[in-house]
């Protein structure tokens, strides 16, 4: 179900909004552009469409490709913003557990144990969670679960840390728990107000994300602006606490071998978050930021396009070679690759066959 957002509680709105908020982005068919080519043997075999925005430290658009102003769903790329909202509402998490609250985790034992710990601190249990039961997101972890005959679990589902943190935030404020995922719940009203505050625009639509939580529609430009405000915030603020926790505990926010964790390790000071359906956002401490949406949701395009966007933002390309794109195989040997279009990456990070 998709709905136009209701007017937020005035008290919550006043508490959460710290800057002017523009009108909601238009709900329209996005005017995506080619962002990556599938090159095999020197021939363009396929094209991935999408949109890219690169922001300077002062918030101005340095580069754009496609449609950066249409309403879209950031999916899990919005989790750092949701975590900021919970800290603003009194959630006392820090360190690896705060990183887990903003995670799309792989379902490793450390993620499950961390989620249990958040619930214990809140005086709650797994049965209080309302996210959907699922197998672990990480392929290797999921395979081991299947071999062991383990069943889908709310704790293993990749958003469980966020849901545990939402429950604790609700409990701390005396809000009801059973309906914490209702968009009209005070917790979700606080999240919506923080989304609007950090993106600088009204929410266009509210629907339900895969985990069951409300999902807020903003623009790609707004998503980049939000992460820039998080990474450039003053020390000690909720924004700075979220950014610091996710950077310091990158694998807690994702998992072993995940590209977003590797990207944060490779680029000093970078905060990065991915989302289903080909979404990526990343920002540096000075406020430079990028956001990417791949129209067909392909991760094979998301990673190299995000790397090329970071190079456009001024990141040393030598730090990004690991993210230049997976090879295309022919007969078991590399014969090409997925490469950002020339408009985005005039000097490709890697050669294609």
Briefly describe each language-model feature range.
Residues 44-49, 78, 274-276:
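Short, flexible loop/turn motifs enriched in small residues
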Residues 4, 9-69:
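Beta-lactamase-like hydrolase cores
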Residues 65-73, 102-105, 148-157, 208-214, ...:
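A short glycine/serine-rich beta->alpha loop
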Residues 231-353:
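Structured C-terminal helix/loop/strand segments within mature extracytoplasmic catalytic/sensor domains
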């Amino acid at each position: 179900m998709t709905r136009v957002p209701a007017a937020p509680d005035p008290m919550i709105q006043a508490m959460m909004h710290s800057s002017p908020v523009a009108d909601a982005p238009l709900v329209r068919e996005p005017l995506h552009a080619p962002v990556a080519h599938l090159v095999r043997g020197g021939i363009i075999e396929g094209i991935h469409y999408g949109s890219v925005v690169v922001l300077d430290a002062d918030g101005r658009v340095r580069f754009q490709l496609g449609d950066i102003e249409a309403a879209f769903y950031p999916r899990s790329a919005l989790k750092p913003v949701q975590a900021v909202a919970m800290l603003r509402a009194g959630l006392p998490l820090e360190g690896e557990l705060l990183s887990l609250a903003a995670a799309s985790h792989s379902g490793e034992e450390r993620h499950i144990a961390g989620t249990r710990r958040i619930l214990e601190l809140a005086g709650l249990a797994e049965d209080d969670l309302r996210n959907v039961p699922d197998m672990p997101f990480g392929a290797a972890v999921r395979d081991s679960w299947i071999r062991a005959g383990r069943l889908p679990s709310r704790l293993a589902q990749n958003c469980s840390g966020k849901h545990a943190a939402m429950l604790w935030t609700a409990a701390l404020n005396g809000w009801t728990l059973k309906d914490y995922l209702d968009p009209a719940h005070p917790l979700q009203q606080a999240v919506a107000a923080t989304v609007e505050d950090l993106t600088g625009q009204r929410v266009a639509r509210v629907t339900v994300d895969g985990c069951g939580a409300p999902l807020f529609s903003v623009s790609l430009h707004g998503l980049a602006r939000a992460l820039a405000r998080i990474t450039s915030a003053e020390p000690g603020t909720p924004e700075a606490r979220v950014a610091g926790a996710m950077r310091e505990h990158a694998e807690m926010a994702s998992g072993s071998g995940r590209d977003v964790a590797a990207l944060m390790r490779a680029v000093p000071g970078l905060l990065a978050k991915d989302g289903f359906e080909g979404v990526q956002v990343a920002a540096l401490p000075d406020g430079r930021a990028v956001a990417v949406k791949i129209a067909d949701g392909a991760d094979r395009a998301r990673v190299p396009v995000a790397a090329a966007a970071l190079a456009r933002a001024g990141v040393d390309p030598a730090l990004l070679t690991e993210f230049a794109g997976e090879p295309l195989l022919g007969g078991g040997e590399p014969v090409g690759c997925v490469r950002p279009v020339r408009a985005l990456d005039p000097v490709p990070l890697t050669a294609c066959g």
